[in-house]
Amino acid sequence: MKDFSLDIYRELLEALLAKGYKLISYRDYVMTSCRNDETSKSRKEEEKFVILRHDVDAKPGNSLKTAQIEKSMGTRATYYFRIPEVTKGGQKGPSGMSYPEIVRAIVKLGHEIGYHYEDMSLCGGDVEQAWGHFKTWLEYFRQYYAVETICMHGAPRSKWDSKDLWKGYDKETGKNYDYKELGVIGEPYLDTDFSDVFYLTDTGRCWDGYKVSVRDRIPGYQEEWSKKGLNWHTTHELIKAIEEGKLPKHVMITTHPQRWTNDSIAWWKELVLQNLKNIIKGLIVG
């Protein structure tokens, strides 16, 4: 079975469910982690869960396919959408579906959606302009869903890290810009307890792509996890590790659905393009 096919994605989810993992959205995680009573703490320690996070960087129609697989298995996930103008293939999906139609379809399947923000990059590092841009597009996505979580888009070729928006401050109030003032309850890179939650991402079209990732990595923890042997390259290796009980109890898995396809031509194209991107990112990381 080909890696990064929809078939092996289903097999990955089946392996997790067979081992007793609960598959949850990022909002589910945040809401549970906010509860601090003793019963909740004990349950959280014992419960096995995987946060399913999808970054919709391109080909949003692919995200609808993974969302349908998850729905058929009775699970929920979170889909973070970039604004349509910068999403490759963002204006049209399968059977001519428009970008808004794809978003609505994923919401209808019971999944969470959020804003995959890159406002610092799009606004050339102008913090004040980026804050206004962020608020505008947050409201855009709230047309389709009551967005409560957001996630930074890495934009590896940009010199600006969009998480730096939260280091900027409002000249009128003298306070830092704060997404929580807008009803946002969580951002995966900023509001996840990575001392408790192990992070896996398919960045680079593999599961150890953090080595060439510019921003989709967890500094301070990545090296520690690697020393513990929590390092797998292919989805086949990851599934084997799950079956052997080697995966930690609490995990966040991030995928980029444009990489997952059963279409042979699209599969090979993605493989070649991603290999080229990895070379470029490797040069950027140094």
Task: Please provide the spans of the model-predicted regions.
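Terminal accessory/targeting
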Residues: 1-53, 57-97, 104, 108-109, ...
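Beta-strand-loop-alpha-helix segment that lines the small-molecule cofactor/substrate pocket
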Residues: 112, 116
